[in-house]
């Protein structure tokens, strides 16, 4: 198994409940294939650098994963098929840090509430 970091952007008009369902679907795929979500972070509704379709903002979500390459391919296939996901990027990592990401640290200094941070060791 290898470590991967995946960030995906969900359309601005999707509710938090629907975002949770999307992440739960990914978690099920990972669990069914003996992988684990090491870390997950909701980065919030953020302004996009440029307009994507009709979206000027998007919900950003980060997953730190311990999975095989086949599971990565399946997750990316599901992300491509999900019309609510407007962009995603998955990269291989040497390890997954137990520290909150720099984006969450910046949000904490701005007094922005953090909705979900989970670290599984």
UniProtKB/Swiss-Prot annotation:
Domain of life from the UniProt record: Bacteria
GO biological-process terms attached to the record: translation
SUPFAM superfamilies registered for this protein in UniProt: Ribosomal protein S6
Cross-referenced HAMAP family: Ribosomal_bS6
Keywords: Ribonucleoprotein, Ribosomal protein, RNA-binding, rRNA-binding
Listed name of the protein: Small ribosomal subunit protein bS6
One term of GO molecular function: small ribosomal subunit rRNA binding
Role, per record: Binds together with bS18 to 16S ribosomal RNA.
InterPro entries the record matches: Ribosomal_bS6 (IPR000529), Ribosomal_bS6_sf (IPR035980), Ribosomal_S6_plastid/chlpt (IPR020814), Transl_elong_EF1B/ribsomal_bS6 (IPR014717)
Pfam families the record matches: Ribosomal_S6
UniProt family annotation: Belongs to the bacterial ribosomal protein bS6 family.
Record-linked NCBIfam families: S6
Protein species of origin: Rickettsia felis (strain ATCC VR-1525 / URRWXCal2) (Rickettsia azadi)
GO cellular-component term (any): cytoplasm
């Amino acid at each position: 198994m290898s470590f991967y970091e995946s960030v995906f952007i969900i359309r601005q008009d999707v509710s938090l409940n629907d975002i949770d369902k999307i992440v739960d679907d990914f978690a099920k795929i990972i669990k069914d294939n003996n992988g684990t979500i090491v870390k997950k972070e909701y980065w919030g509704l953020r302004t996009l650098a440029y307009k994507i379709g009709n979206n000027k903002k998007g919900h950003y979500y980060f997953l730190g994963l311990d999975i095989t390459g086949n599971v990565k391919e399946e997750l990316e296939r599901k992300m491509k098929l999900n019309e609510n996901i407007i962009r995603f990027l998955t990269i291989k990592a040497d390890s997954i840090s137990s520290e909150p990401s720099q984006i969450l640290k910046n949000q904490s200094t701005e007094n922005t509430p953090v909705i979900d941070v989970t670290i599984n060791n």
